[in-house]
Amino acid sequence: MEDKNILYESIPTSTNNNELLPLQLIPIKPNITQEEQDLLDNIVKNESIIPMSPKIPININNNNTINNNNNNNSNNVSSGNHITNSNSNSSGNLKDSFDLNSVIDSTCVMTSPIAVSPPIINKLINNKENILNINGILENNINCTNDNQELINILLNKNQLQQQQQQQQQLYLQQQQLQQLQQQIQQIQQQLQQQQQQNSIFRPITPKIIDQQTQPQPQPQTQTTQQPSSQQPFSYEKTPVLASRTISTQKSNSPIPFPNLGTLINDPINSTSSTASNTKSQIPSTPLLVKSTENIQTTPQSNNNDNNDNNNNNNSKNNNNLTDINEDKNNGIEQSSSGNTTTSSITMTAAATTTTTTTTATTATTTTATTTSIKVEPKKKSTSLWSFKTYLYDEIHGGYLSNEANDTLKREQVYNFVHVPWELEKLISFGFLVCFDSFLFLFTFLPIRFFLSFLKFLISPFSKKNKLTTNQIFDLFRGFIWVTCFVFLNFIDSSMLYHYIRGQAVIKLYVIYNVLEVLDKLCCSFGQDIFDSLYWMSFSLTSSNRNRQDGLVPKQRNETRILGPFTHLLVATGYVCLHSLVLFSQVITLNVAINSYNNALLTLMISNQFVELKGSVFKRFEKENLFQISCSDIVERFQAFIFLTIIIFQNLSDLNWDLSWDFAINMLTVVGTVWGSEVLVDAIKHAFITKFNKFSPQMYSKFFVLLSDTIVDPRNRNFTESSWGVNNIIGFVPFPLASIVVRVFHKFIPSKGIFGIFLMVQIYICLVLLKIFIKIIILGQCLSKTTNYDNTTTTILSSSSSSSSSNSLNTTSTTSTSTSTTNDKKNN
């Protein structure tokens, strides 16, 4: 039996898995003494319970207990024993009514005031506070359990999400694997189809044993003709050839001369309904009629068709996987349009093979309507066995397999191969003139521009109006660079350098020459960028001067803008000195090779040009790469011209300008070998590049138009400094070459006396006239090329629009003309 006066405390419990279990109730015994218990019994003597809420039930045992309590109160005065009894009875009633487990809220007990000692009141208050604290602890525990349950739910949801994500990733990986497997299966199927096609095309001539007893009887059909033929126990039969074969026009980069051997071995046979008799006399083997090239399904069993001729007529209904019709070896069968639906489709393809690729579906349907039946005559079998005599006759009098489409392609490739060097030389000659024009500009008009800019620079501090422009500052920079490089090259002794190089071994000289060529190309690629940046820095210098006068730029920033162009000027000067030194060493090395006794070094240097073929021919090139190679060939050609000119004049000066026939012949042979090797190597290189990459020779004319468009720029009205923009495209820097020419030729001109001054004036006038003449030629070529290109583009656009509109109307005419041409060829 449980005591009703015992309180219970709820304590949360947990397991090892951190799972919360239901609350456990632990009994709490209140510490109440006997005096306190007696006082409590006296308190509730005249109690009257007033319910505050009608909804809450009040546990009252019976009315007799109340009456008994009243009687006990009346007899209370008589004796103390009666008081103790009444106190015991009232305490029992209090115990019965004071049930802590029952919920009695919203009630009020009205009693009379009784004097109670303070310690008892304090103890009662403490008990109440303990009870309230216990209730608060219980509420906190309940809240904690709710929070823990929420956390557990969140963790469970996270785990479920992670599992779902893992499942999705696994599914994605499985899908990728399936896709890879499908791709592999497709590749394997394509390989099998290619092998089957090759087996069907390259099937050798196999002997066929014909047995008279095992041949099937021909089925009765409409319009059949039986022609008995002599049976041979052993004969040879040629395998049929595909009638409709697509010509692959894909671009191939392989240098093999015959990449499509299948098209050369087996030639497609054009057969029509109107020329059935001609095909009989011309082609001894039966043609293989094909529905379409896409539906060809050849299997390894197709090689054994010769052994399965007995079942061909019985399996004629299975036309979905079969693409050919096997003829009867004894009887010629005339097939009509009412015989089977497959004959109409086959006749359609047989008639469509003779037409061109531009025929439409409407023309094919018209051909099927007109050619309702084809009379296929039986093949005349060879009555004689194979012999050595027939083999020799075929070798001596046999013909060659030919294919018109492939023959035209090969012929066009040969024409392009021969035509490429001519187009290349036109482009290189134009670029040579452009480089020569910019080279002569440094000797003719740049000194005048430099002199005028220098005078304006001297006058500018004294006048506010005469300020230097960007072009004038750039001219001053270029003149300073040229003069500095000339002074630098004068400190180099050419004779000492010549004998030092001549004393080296041949192999060492060969290595030195190759290193100098590589350095030259690197310097050319870097030099043009330096001069472009120098121009823009001079522009910033002029803009900083204007802003400084207006007070828009602070002093520190203005100082950096002023010092920037001068640092660029130092870098450009160092570059020109280094590049000119490389070219000067290259000229002396070439001079040593020309003047050598056995010409071994010259042959090595010429063979070095042929090494370029290995690095450029057998590679894949785009149009941009081809244009870059063409521009580098232009620069190399012009540098070779300047080098040979310097060597000729240097050798003439060593002979005291005594021009003899031996010297002239020797120099002409050397110049011819060096120049001819350059031309030959460039022609071979570009011819094979265009052949392997399927480029047309008209590509060089497009490059010509590109260069001419930059020269004939509408923004430049007088065409002044137009070659400078072309030099950026070509990659030609004229300053190092000009510095070498001045370094070599200044000692040939006498510097003292009137004769020297008069000679210099004459040379200057000749150079000016030569530059003007070259400029006129360049502008004329540019204008003519641009106008021709515009005319060709307009004609091409108009022809394309007209051809697209009339293409549908001319399809039937093309079919008729193609059939007539094929008939004429066969009759011939």
From Swiss-Prot:
Residues 67-83, 212-233, 302-321, 797-822 have a biased composition (Low complexity). Belongs to the TAPT1 family. PANTHER family: TRANSMEMBRANE ANTERIOR POSTERIOR TRANSFORMATION PROTEIN 1 HOMOLOG. Residues 67-92, 212-236, 297-346, 797-828 are annotated as: Disordered. It is a multi-pass membrane protein. The keyword DNA damage does not apply. Keywords: Membrane, Transmembrane, Transmembrane helix. It is found in: Membrane. The chain crosses the membrane at residues 428-448, 472-492, 562-582, 722-742, 754-774. This is Protein TAPT1 homolog. Its main location: membrane. The keyword Membrane applies. One of its GO terms (cellular component) is endoplasmic reticulum membrane.
